[in-house]
């Protein structure tokens, strides 16, 4: 049985983005109408739709959510993979903020990080296109290019047999996306906004992937261990199977945990 649930930016790391128009944003959240993509037995809405719902629920200050520093890679492959995920997530946030200079900076950083994990060739064209489309302020096209860059990176990593690292890219993007979602919702709380966090199946999915890591050294990596603990701590807050409402206090707790983890990923060794 397939599961459908809401989530900011998860599709960024797991599925293709569908460009959409602001006037198409619904007045309230109807998950059954979200364009979605399937990962194994999990169906997720595309990020543009979730962003538009947030815009409809309030007026997020996207520029305030963009990180000034993208972080520094340590050369440690797990950290670089997680960092790459956060940087690509940052790209979508910068697009929502319509910050052309930040988008171009992120495009360059994606290329640099891809080089560290030996998949630079997979994103050279995308990086150039991100810069060109950002200069033209063609935000829909930039969204598509960021999603394409992620898919190219993941595909190249899997071709190299780096399946576990590819999952870490996904998790890095999800963690950063969840940090931003909880930040926005906590500043203008509503039950509809908080409902975007209800995602027990995804937490189980990521936990299974971490538990299935075969490389002992990777499985014991400090950041991987930290993320495993974070998922376990978040599950009772956003993984309620009974559909219980997620309170503003829970949203703030999730934000604190994801923010600390993003900080560990982006500043480790910096």
Please state what every model-predicted region is.
Residues 1-8:
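Bacterial N-terminal signal peptides that target proteins for export
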Residues 18-22:
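Sec/Tat signal peptide C-region and signal peptidase I cleavage site
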Residues 23-130:
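N-terminal Sec/ER secretory leader and immediately downstream segment
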Residues 91-98, 117, 121, 156-160, ...:
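Secondary-structure edge/capping motif, primarily at the C-terminal ends of alpha-helices
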Residues 133-217:
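Extended amphipathic alpha-helical interaction segments
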Residues 215-270:
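A cross-kingdom marker for long, charged
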